[in-house]
């Protein structure tokens, strides 16, 4: 039975709050009169997904189809979230990816997606003990918890009113009848739900600081524990004369140092074991620390924070950020008693599993696969592991079932010929993906994190296998992707579909490389850095330095002029409000005898001077003038009506009320950061800024007066376009699609916009209507890269939340006849003679010469 959401299916939870001193709340159900008790929601009631999910939106859906972009695949994993993993069966893993929950089949690698209901992000996911349901706790103003059935993925229940801004954690009790949720700032609300009836049973403020976790006791379902920043709290659901109450007792650290607590578990007898930031375990009884547990020799139980504690089938497991899982003797822990004033008790683990030095575990969950128990673990270094914790001679080895980038994606590039893309991140890896078959093909790791990346155009490398990558230590590496099966004498021997080879490495900068760009003819390669320099190289088989120039600020972006411009120039955008333009330097023509510093390159500067305050002032003056005119028009109309009725009206001027003073012109002390920009014509360019000056696209032009010190310049844009809803949500990335003219904007809040371009030149009218969708995480998913595939069939975005998404720009019916219906990758062939070359010697030390 499937229905539209019914009024009587919606809860009306109490909005009552609690003082910190009175930490109990009476059940809302017990306070209702008989006439107030709601009708029971039938077991067979379902919502329709189309009514629940947050889809794309168009400001004018007559002109812009909401199917302009179709979500295709998720390549990333937000592995640095505290808990972002659930197992629904032996081969299906679920995790949050921006505004989607991804359910991935580990065998077939296929994915299913569930969108958030509000488009404001997702705070937690948790599976029901039966695996027949899972809960999705969302973010945003008065967010929902949506319960879905599995495997049908139908929305079953929607819980409302449990927190103000975001849910951070949720847990079902052992029998699955109740759900506990906890919210973020400002309310930190703990709510106990009768989730099948969408009813709030109990609620209380959990604490006055960040709460990380809530969990029911496995043995006593009337007990719960919450923990977080500098605290742990023990809760009981108690039946009193006035009804069911939630009573909380704050744990007291006593002589033990206060710790943030991310992990705990209640033992069968009611004691609680928690982790600490320094790696030891604390045994709590009656709200007090009974003992602190460490290893023999006063070694901590883990090197670093304990991220999870699990009590399973009589065994106690601790999971550490150090990549180790240890199994402890439950009896020893439960009966531990202090022997001296230190309060420390030493013990040895019964068994342990160390996954490696570059592994950092956040969470693990158990699933039965063909009646065999396996654990799946979330590794914040960018992996999901399958583990066997039976610790016997038949135990399976740990298996990495998926690998990903760890942390935000810094840069992305696409092949000029085929459906290959490359990404890099501060996790020190470069990854190659086939976005036709939705698969990761190859990974190469280096000593420092990647910060910039560009795929060499066809004019530079006709095979399409060359990629330039910049790193946080100022290095630039030229790598090549090739099909190893095409190497001489390697038929059938290659394990990988694509391999990556380091071709060249050089260090042009003393700080992180932030931008890389090839000149349109492919003769010159430019690199920009936080060290306020731009370095130029000649593009040959081996890149050779031409020299560098100094610029007024850390480099944010580089863009060479398009082929339509008469002269080849480089637009250099600096973080601190400067734009610089230089011609392409000619190799051998620069005065770089003693150093590589180019001092005679003609340079034009633009130092952005804020005009937003003046725009706002002009808008306010215009608003007041319009208001006056409307009032005068209404007055004259009234006089006319009175006279038509034969009444005498004295036509006197109304006394003007005293106006509020106009706001003063404001110029921010700190210059607003330039986020992105692009050429519009020779010497002209558009800018998007953050900070105070967000909210507009600014059209700017280099002047020919360059005698003045750049620092003293005050250059104003000559035109502006107000961009709707961007005052607090600036545009960070802009990219264009030419076949179906579109301008794509990647926003700070992780949303994606597409503006149809009816004419070449941008204007207020052209950028009035747009398509948008919240795709990346709203809080930390700022879009850091957008690019179209070589044939403009796909759009790819990457974000600060570690996610990489692909979208289809055409449906199957819309694909032009000249293009194949299916995307099939063609891996570039290896360079002739590659198999005979010695491996390129990498630069490994951070102190290498610039």
Where does each model-flagged region fall?
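Beta-strand-rich domains and repeat architectures in extracellular enzymes and scaffolds
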Residues: 72-100, 121-123
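Structural hallmark of WD40 beta-propellers
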Residues: 90-92, 111, 131-136, 143-144, ...
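Conserved strand-to-loop turn within each blade of WD40 beta-propeller repeats
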Residues: 137-141, 182-186, 226-229, 275-278, ...
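Per-blade loop-tip surfaces of WD-repeat and WD-like beta-propellers in eukaryotic adaptors/scaffolds
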Residues: 103-111, 142-157, 164, 186-202, ...
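Canonical WD40 repeat/beta-propeller blade segments in eukaryotic WD-repeat proteins
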Residues: 80-85, 120-127, 164-172, 209-216, ...
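Terminal intrinsically disordered, low-complexity extensions flanking WD-repeat/beta-propeller proteins
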Residues: 2-4, 8, 12-15, 19-29, ...
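Surface loop/turn motifs at the tips and blade-to-blade linkers of beta-strand repeat domains
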Residues: 74-77, 114-118, 159-163, 204-207, ...
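Solenoidal tandem-repeat scaffolds enriched in leucines and small polar residues
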Residues: 179-277
């Amino acid at each position: 039975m499937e229905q539209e959401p019914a009024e009587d299916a919606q809860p009306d939870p109490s909005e009552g709050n609690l003082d910190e001193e009175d930490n109990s709340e009476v059940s809302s159900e017990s306070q209702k009169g008989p006439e107030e008790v709601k009708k029971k929601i039938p077991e067979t009631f379902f919502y329709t997904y189309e009514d629940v999910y947050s889809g794309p939106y168009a400001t004018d859906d007559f002109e812009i189809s909401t199917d302009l972009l179709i979500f295709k695949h998720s390549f990333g994993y937000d592995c640095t979230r505290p808990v972002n993993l659930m197992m629904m069966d032996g081969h299906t893993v679920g995790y949050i990816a921006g505004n989607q929950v991804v359910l991935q089949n580990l065998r077939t690698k296929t994915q299913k997606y569930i969108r958030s209901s509000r488009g404001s992000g997702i705070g937690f996911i948790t599976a029901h003990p039966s695996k027949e349901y899972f809960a999705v706790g969302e973010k945003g103003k008065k967010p929902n918890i949506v319960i879905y059935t599995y495997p049908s993925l139908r929305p079953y229940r929607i819980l409302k009113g449990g927190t103000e801004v975001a849910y951070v954690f949720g847990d079902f009790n052992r029998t699955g009848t109740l759900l506990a949720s906890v919210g973020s700032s400002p309310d930190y609300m703990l709510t106990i739900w009768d989730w099948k009836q969408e009813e709030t049973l109990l609620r209380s403020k959990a604490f006055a600081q960040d709460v990380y976790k809530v969990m029911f006791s496995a043995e006593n379902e009337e007990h719960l524990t919450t923990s977080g920043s500098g605290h742990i709290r023990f809760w009981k659901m108690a039946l009193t004369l006035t009804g069911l109450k939630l009573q909380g007792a704050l744990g007291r650290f006593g002589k033990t140092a206060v710790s943030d607590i991310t992990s705990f578990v209640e033992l069968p007898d009611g004691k609680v074991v928690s982790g600490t930031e320094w790696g030891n375990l604390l045994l709590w009884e009656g709200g007090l620390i009974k003992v602190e547990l460490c290893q023999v020799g006063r070694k901590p139980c883990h090197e670093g924070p304990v991220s999870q504690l699990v009590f399973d089938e009589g065994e106690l497991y601790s999971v550490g950020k150090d990549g180790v899982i240890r199994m402890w003797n439950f009896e020893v822990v439960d009966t531990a008693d202090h022997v001296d004033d230190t309060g420390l008790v030493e013990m040895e683990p019964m068994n342990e599993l160390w996954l490696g030095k570059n592994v950092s575990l956040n969470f693990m969950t158990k699933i039965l696969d063909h009646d065999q128990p396996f654990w799946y673990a979330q590794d914040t270094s960018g992996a999901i592991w399958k583990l066997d914790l039976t610790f016997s001679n038949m135990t399976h080895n740990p298996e990495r079932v998926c690998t990903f980038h760890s942390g935000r994606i810094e840069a992305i590039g696409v092949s000029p010929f085929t459906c290959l893309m490359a990404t890099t991140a501060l996790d020190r890896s470069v990854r190659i993906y086939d976005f036709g078959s939705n698969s990761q093909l190859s990974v190469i790791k280096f000593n420092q994190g990647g910060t910039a990346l560009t795929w060499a155009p066809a004019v530079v490398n006709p095979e399409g296998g060359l990629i330039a990558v910049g790193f946080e230590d100022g290095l630039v590496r030229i790598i090549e992707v090739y099909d190893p099966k095409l190497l001489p004498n390697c038929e059938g021997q290659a394990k990988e579909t694509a391999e990556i080879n380091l071709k060249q490495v050089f260090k042009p900068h003393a700080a992180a490389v932030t931008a890389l760009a090839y000149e349109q003819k492919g003769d010159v390669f430019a690199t920009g850095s936080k060290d306020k320099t731009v370095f130029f190289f000649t593009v040959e088989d081996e890149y050779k330095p031409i020299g560098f120039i100094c610029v007024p600020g850390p480099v944010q972006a580089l863009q060479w002029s398009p082929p339509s411009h008469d002269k080849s120039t480089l637009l250099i955008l600096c973080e601190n409000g400067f734009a610089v333009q230089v011609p392409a330097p000619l190799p051998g023509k620069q005065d770089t005898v003693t150093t590589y510093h180019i001092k005679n390159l003609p340079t034009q500067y633009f130092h952005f001077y804020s005009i937003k305050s003046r725009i706002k002032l002009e808008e306010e003056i215009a608003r007041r003038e319009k208001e006056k005119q409307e009032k005068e028009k209404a007055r004259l109309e009234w006089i006319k009506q009175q006279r038509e009725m034969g009444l005498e009206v004295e036509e006197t001027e109304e006394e003007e009320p005293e106006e509020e003073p106009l706001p003063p012109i404001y110029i921010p002390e700190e210059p607003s950061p330039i986020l992105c920009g692009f050429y519009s014509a020779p010497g002209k360019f558009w800018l998007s800024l953050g900070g105070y000056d967000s909210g507009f696209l600014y059209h700017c032009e280099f002047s020919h007066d360059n005698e003045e010190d750049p620092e003293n310049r005050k250059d104003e844009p000559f035109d502006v376009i107000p961009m709707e809803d961007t005052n607090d949500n600036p545009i960070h990335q802009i990219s264009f699609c030419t076949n179906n003219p579109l301008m794509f904007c990647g926003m700070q809040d992780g949303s994606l916009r597409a503006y149809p371009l009816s004419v070449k030149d941008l204007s207020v009218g052209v950028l009035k209507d747009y398509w948008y969708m919240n795709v990346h995480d709203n809080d930390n998913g700022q879009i850091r890269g957008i690019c179209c595939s070589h044939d403009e069939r796909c759009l790819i975005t990457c974000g600060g939340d570690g996610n990489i998404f692909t979208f289809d720009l055409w449906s199957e019916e819309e694909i032009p006849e000249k293009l194949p219906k299916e995307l099939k990758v063609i891996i570039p062939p290896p360079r002739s003679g590659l198999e005979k070359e010695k491996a390129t010697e990498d630069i490994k030390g951070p102190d290498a010469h610039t």
